[in-house]
Amino acid sequence: MNLVVIEGIDASGKTTLAKRLAESLSPRFKVLLTQEPFTDDIKQLLEKYQWKDQVLLALLFSADRRIHVKWMESQNVDLIISDRYFFSTLAYQGVGVDRTWLESLSSIFPLPNLTILLDVPVNVALERLRNKRDSLDFEEKRKSLHQVRENYLSLARRYNFKILDGTLPLEKLTSISLELVQGLLSSSTSRGSQGT
């Protein structure tokens, strides 16, 4: 399973880039686009109760992710592109939960072949969010996004993410990302042909 993950803070452009990558690669490869949270039940629970307990959220996201990973492993495709993965739990719940516990919880999940971090300044993300939603507490969101962004940058160093400037035009981000993904697919194809 070739797994590419797109990560970043809220409003960094993850979903848009993931869709564009899938569209660009689909003519030549069997591509599956997915996202987390994965199951509708978890999404509905999160929307209904709006929980703030970060331990509870980490457990819910991990249960959802376990279902997601099992489903991904059952797919017969060349590439899976996921909008978020366990790094989101480490970045977001890592603001208020013991990092060692979170990493232990996430250790059962396979590492992606490639993780792209769309890095945007918090003020850019907040402006994008302001254009989407009316009722955000921007001061609270600003404080938490600063820490989440720092967590992502720390994870990027540790897990060797490819960091892209999320303020670049979509065409440029797509071009850079396609190059990275095609490099991954070429190397996995050549490894597969060497084994035959």
Swiss-Prot record:
Keyword line: ATP-binding, Kinase, Nucleotide biosynthesis, Nucleotide-binding, Transferase
Identification of the protein by name? Probable thymidylate kinase
Which NCBIfam families does this chain map to?
A: DTMP_kinase (TIGR00041)
Enumerate the residues binding ATP. Answer: G8, I9, D10, A11, S12, G13, K14, T15
* Pfam (any one): Thymidylate_kin
**An MF annotation (GO) of this entry:** ATP binding
Checking PROSITE patterns in the record gives: THYMIDYLATE_KINASE (PS01331)
Q: What is the lineage of its organism?
A: Archaea, Thermoproteota, Thermoprotei, Sulfolobales, Sulfolobaceae
Q: What reaction does this catalyse?
A: dTMP + ATP = dTDP + ADP
Task: Name the Gene3D superfamilies on file.
Answer: P-loop containing nucleotide triphosphate hydrolases
Q: Which InterPro entries match?
A: P-loop_NTPase (IPR027417), Thymidylate_kin-like_dom (IPR039430), Thymidylate_kin_CS (IPR018095), Thymidylate_kinase (IPR018094)
The family annotation for this protein states:
Belongs to the thymidylate kinase family.
| Claim: ATP-binding is one of the keywords in the record | yes
Enzyme Commission number(s) from the entry: 2.7.4.9
Q: Which PANTHER family match?
A: THYMIDYLATE KINASE, UMP-CMP KINASE 2, MITOCHONDRIAL
